[in-house]
Curated annotation (Swiss-Prot):
Protein location: Cytoplasm; Nucleus, Nucleolus; Cell membrane; Lysosome membrane
Family: Belongs to the heat shock protein 70 family.
Membrane topology, record value: Peripheral membrane protein
Residue numbers spanned by region Disordered: 614-646
Record-level Gene Ontology MF annotations: ATP binding; ATP hydrolysis activity; ATP-dependent protein folding chaperone; heat shock protein binding; phosphoprotein binding; protein folding chaperone; protein-macromolecule adaptor activity
The protein, known as: Heat shock cognate 71 kDa protein
Domain remarks in the Swiss-Prot or TrEMBL record: The N-terminal nucleotide binding domain (NBD) (also known as the ATPase domain) is responsible for binding and hydrolyzing ATP. The C-terminal substrate-binding domain (SBD) (also known as peptide-binding domain) binds to the client/substrate proteins. The two domains are allosterically coupled so that, when ATP is bound to the NBD, the SBD binds relatively weakly to clients. When ADP is bound in the NBD, a conformational change enhances the affinity of the SBD for client proteins.
The organism's place on the tree of life at top rank: Eukaryota
GO biological process: chaperone cofactor-dependent protein refolding; clathrin coat disassembly; embryo development ending in birth or egg hatching; embryonic organ development; gastrulation; protein refolding; protein targeting to lysosome involved in chaperone-mediated autophagy
Induction: Up-regulated by insulin in cultured embryos.
Annotated organism of origin: Gallus gallus
Entry's Gene Ontology cellular component terms: cytoplasm; cytosol; lysosomal membrane; nucleolus; nucleus; plasma membrane; ribonucleoprotein complex
Function: Molecular chaperone implicated in a wide variety of cellular processes, including protection of the proteome from stress, folding and transport of newly synthesized polypeptides, chaperone-mediated autophagy, activation of proteolysis of misfolded proteins and the formation and dissociation of protein complexes. Plays a pivotal role in the protein quality control system, ensuring the correct folding of proteins, the re-folding of misfolded proteins and controlling the targeting of proteins for subsequent degradation.
Segments of this protein annotated with the region Nucleotide-binding domain (NBD): 2-386
Length: 646
């Protein structure tokens, strides 16, 4: 295949989306199911690996081996409180591998474990394939988005996932920034405008304030809640209906994973319905112990169940405004992103907060981020189209970065919301006389003391010549590149001795070797998936051939046209094959093909003989001649047209 354009991928917590900029506009690409967003789900079964809709659709049957929310694990430590609290809610198992979380599943009868980067890479591979199927070209370059909240290791983990999926990640950009780009193309303005991006998706909530002036974006502030989204609204509905089931039927379904999963699917559907209707019905046959669950819910009740969550979305809005030092009256445009912003109550709360201001809903909220990422991909790969030419992008660091100084104080070198790329240098000294070295501990966070912030990594600068405290000069430099990835170095001015940090694995980093191994494994899994598809196709081919043959010779119009002995031979062989199929569902492709050849050896001569003697098949035989080689029709006009049926 020829080389295709760069794409933009919104790798979401619950759903992902891919877009491409071509023919002067962005096209959001639908998957093989016709959906423009694809669930970020990967499932493992005894026979195959499923990604996307196929994985999500079978989750009720296979909850422990269906993995989602990998984005919540990426770039985190196993003992991270977020990981620990999330694990309680997941039906799949997360294990500790040298301090890093891995997802453990049963796949093809074996226990396998995968890093979150590998799971995310499978979703990215799926998005890459969706784009390739649509474009008819290979896709290698991509811009991938992350929440504004993501720290350094989460960004790096996302980049690693791209590498494992065989993508060249041109840049990692913040989701709100991507939405702003999507928006910037729609509405060109000269004067400076302040934009508030309100992004409420399936799993995360981000509020960002940006300014746009003459096509130049600047992010002023970000705030949000990494744990609020559509799934939380689904959970409230699920709990409501579990309680209702208990009241009506005196039975508790909460311990039955499959029942809860089926209920959750119905709740998600009801929630979507309630964005356009004021009432939704739920009908689940045999939900628990054979009891059918038929009920309904009104929009008002749904709003009441989620009232605190809905209202709570305004707190980060206020925080973002404070950080940007803006009053709400100074916001020119409010942009809705994420499927949950379709909820009328959320739109109303936001509109009322901004004193009745109209909200911008012109961009499909599920697609806005991928849309902007696709534009950014076009810019970075040198698209000369005037639509993208005058667009420039300034991103920011989501959290302040600094080092620990005497007494555990956080000394900030780069303040949060600093435009990146950026580089800051500050000079430090020793704390005690004749101190031989300094420990540089790098933190991110907004608290005054480092113990309340997040340690990114540490390194030592040793070999400082003996000197009284306060004399040595140690220059510390923080350098952040355009992807938000941080390098920290320290130099002793007197000796020129330098050390810099490679933020190591205890930060949730994958080593080069790990990534290379995972790239190879990803290839292997892909090959296995294809082999599985071929196998199923030969199995189905044999299956339908045997059944069609059997149907042909059992046709009541046949007696007298075929020798009893031949008739019996075909029947015996067909039954033998059908029995063999029942016992060998998981045989190899070659075995299915071999069995089909054996069956054809018996059937073809007899059927050919039948045709030649009868001058064509008797009419009314279903579906024409079912088989491998189509023999000549004996020239009789009464016979059906013969076609191959696979």
């Amino acid at each position: 295949m020829s080389k295709g354009p760069a794409v933009g991928i919104d790798l979401g917590t619950t759903y992902s989306c891919v877009g491409v900029f071509q023919h002067g506009k962005v096209e959001i690409i639908a998957n093989d199911q016709g959906n423009r967003t694809t669930p970020s789900y990967v499932a493992f079964t005894d026979t195959e690996r499923l990604i996307g809709d196929a994985a999500k659709n079978q989750v009720a049957m296979n909850p422990t081996n269906t993995v989602f929310d990998a984005k919540r694990l990426i770039g985190r430590r196993f003992d991270d409180s977020v990981v620990q609290s999330d694990m309680k809610h997941w039906p799949f198992t997360v294990v500790n591998d040298a301090g890093r979380p891995k997802v453990q599943v049963e796949y093809k009868g074996e226990t396998k474990s995968f890093y979150p980067e590998e799971i995310s890479s499978m979703v990215l591979t799926k998005m890459k394939e969706i784009a390739e199927a649509y474009l008819g070209k290979t896709v290698t370059n991509a811009v991938v988005t992350v929440p504004a909240y993501f720290n350094d290791s989460q960004r790096q983990g996302t980049k690693d996932a791209g590498t494992i999926a065989g993508l060249n990640v041109l840049r990692i950009i913040n989701e709100p920034t991507a939405a702003a780009i999507a928006y910037g193309l729609d509405k060109k303005v000269g004067a400076e405008r302040n934009l508030l991006i309100f992004d409420l998706g399936g799993g995360t909530f981000d509020v960002s304030i940006l300014t746009i002036e003459n096509g130049i974006f600047e992010v002023k502030s970000t705030a949000g809640d990494t744990h609020l989204g559509g799934e939380d609204f689904d959970n409230r509905l699920v709990n409501h209906f579990i309680a209702e089931f208990k009241r009506k039927h005196k039975k508790d379904i909460s311990e039955n994973k499959r029942a809860v999963r089926r209920l959750r699917t119905a709740c998600e559907r009801a929630k979507r319905t309630l964005s356009s209707s004021t009432q939704a019905s739920i009908e689940i046959d045999s939900l628990y112990e054979g009891i059918d669950f038929y009920t309904s819910i009104t929009r008002a009740r749904f709003e009441k169940l989620n009232a605190d969550l809905f209202r709570g979305t305004l707190d980060p809005v206020e925080k973002a405004l404070r950080d940007a030092k803006l009053d709400k009256s100074q916001i020119h445009d409010i942009v809705l992103v994420g499927g949950s912003t379709r909820i009328p109550k959320i739109q109303k709360l936001l509109q009322d907060f901004f004193n009745g201001k109209e909200l911008n809903k012109s961009i499909n909220p599920d697609e806005a981020v991928a849309y902007g990422a696709a534009v950014q991909a076009a810019i970075l790969s040198g698209d000369k189209s005037e639509n993208v030419q005058d667009l420039l992008l300034l991103d920011v660091t989501p959290l302040s970065l600094g080092i620990e100084t005497a007494g555990g104080v956080m000394t900030v070198l780069i303040k949060r919301n600093t435009t990146i790329p950026t580089k800051q240098t500050q000079t430090f000294t020793t704390y005690s006389d004749n101190q031989p070295g300094v420990l540089i501990q790098v933190y991110e966070g907004e608290r005054a003391m480092t113990k309340d912030n997040n340690l990114l990594g540490k390194f030592e600068l040793t070999g400082i010549p003996p000197a009284p405290r306060g004399v040595p000069q140690i220059e510390v430099t923080f350098d952040i590149d355009a992807n938000g990835i941080l390098n920290v170095s320290a130099v002793d001015k007197s000796t020129g001795k330098e050390n810099k940090i490679t933020i190591t694995n205890d930060k949730g980093r994958l080593s080069k070797e790990d990534i290379e191994r995972m790239v190879q494994e990803a290839e292997k899994y892909k090959a296995e998936d294809e082999k599985q598809r071929d196998k199923v196709s030969s199995k189905n081919s044999l299956d339908s051939y045997a059944f069609n043959m059997k149907a042909t010779v059992e046709d009541e119009k046949l007696p007298g046209k075929i020798l009893d002995e031949d008739h019996q031979n075909i029947l015996d062989k067909c039954n033998e094959i059908i029995n063999w199929l029942d016992k060998n569902q998981t045989a190899e492709k070659e075995e299915f093909e071999h069995q089909q050849k054996e069956l054809e050896k018996v059937c073809n001569p007899i059927i050919t003989k039948l045709y030649q003697s009868a001058g064509g098949m008797p009419g009314g035989m279903p579906g024409g001649f079912p088989g491998g080689g189509a023999p000549p029709s004996g020239g009789a006009s009464s016979g059906p047209t013969i076609e191959e049926v696979d």
